[in-house]
């Protein structure tokens, strides 16, 4: 197995330019493909997940061109009518491609087979499929019911229909439905139960609006796209830096003295994970923000405070808090993280196992993790990453106290291929 050994380094400082947001990149690419007109999307993330979306769009007949030596893509939209009506799409483990494309293909009509790697076939999609069937889509499971792979067939979608979706598994299901509603000639989605990860739904709605469609809403319980809604190109649009990726560097500043500044995202970000900075501040870190940057440094006391925090609003960035808890002065509890269990791996179980290797006392439940740090971290732990990019990036922070080995470090290619180079650039 390939591994990366990180030597201990107690002090980190510097500036990191963030790559584009994965969540924004894949949403913008899909909306540009569905719109009328040509769209220039600037700053698209270069990573496995966006590659899967770009490849799928090309297979579906979308004309796109990348500007030389840049991450700008010119996309000629299809006005909601996919040029290719039959395709076999491999989407890896990219949930931000698989879920939205499932909805956009099911409501537009055609014959499609969607599949991915083994882990993608373990990630639930049944709630989204049922909601799409409620709008008249015809979808069958090609393997285990409730999970990919999927076969999509031409359906009988009735404009203005109403469907329901559960809100407690993944907000990506609702986001996928919202982006696809204009393809159905408008309609309504009602949310059953408490919606998790609300900031990601807000992000989706903001981007939909940038492409000329306004979705009416009743809080987070009911969303309606009016009949006749059509996506229109905004001309040019820019992808923010990835706020989830910012969390590792901001934590590095809080744990390693700092200051560490990230650029590409700031106080006006449309991403919910920007609130990770608030969580660090609650732990005592010094936080400062500008329009296009955030900076973190260690508390004046030199050590973070333990916290109890509801992480519903920052599910991805909350993983970074779990590792930061190793450096806090007591027991930290992170709650409302049930969605961790259906991500790239069961992140609650994986996090508990790997924190334990570093000497932490860890307690877990269905939707929480509680971490009590040891007096001294165990040096030389070999951290398994479970083919999960965020596990690899989170546990690099342990090297602020002890030497650590990261197994399968290349898994960061899913969202941030250059992560370890960027992390190394902060070593004083």
Curated annotation (Swiss-Prot):
Keywords: Amino-acid biosynthesis, Aromatic amino acid biosynthesis, Cytoplasm, Transferase
UniProt EC number: 2.5.1.19
S-S pairs: none
GO MF entry, a single one: 3-phosphoshikimate 1-carboxyvinyltransferase activity
UniProt GO BP: amino acid biosynthetic process; aromatic amino acid family biosynthetic process; chorismate biosynthetic process
Any Pfam family matching the protein: EPSP_synthase
Subcellular location: Cytoplasm
Residues noted as binding phosphoenolpyruvate in the record, renumbered to the chain: 22, 95, 123, 172, 347, 390, 414
Binding-site residues for 3-phosphoshikimate, renumbered to this chain: 22-23, 27, 170-172, 197, 316, 343
Pathway: Metabolic intermediate biosynthesis; chorismate biosynthesis; chorismate from D-erythrose 4-phosphate and phosphoenolpyruvate: step 6/7
Main location: cytoplasm
Catalytic site positions: 316
Enzyme class: transferase
Highest taxon listed in the record's lineage: Bacteria
Catalysed reactions, semicolon-separated: 3-phosphoshikimate + phosphoenolpyruvate = 5-O-(1-carboxyvinyl)-3-phosphoshikimate + phosphate
InterPro entries with a match to the protein in the record: Enolpyruvate_Tfrase_dom, Enolpyruvate_Tfrase_sf, EPSP_synthase, EPSP_synthase_CS, RNA3'P_cycl/enolpyr_Trfase_a/b
Biological role: Catalyzes the transfer of the enolpyruvyl moiety of phosphoenolpyruvate (PEP) to the 5-hydroxyl of shikimate-3-phosphate (S3P) to produce enolpyruvyl shikimate-3-phosphate and inorganic phosphate.
Family: Belongs to the EPSP synthase family.
Subunit annotation: Monomer.
Entry protein name: 3-phosphoshikimate 1-carboxyvinyltransferase
Protein source organism: Laribacter hongkongensis (strain HLHK9)
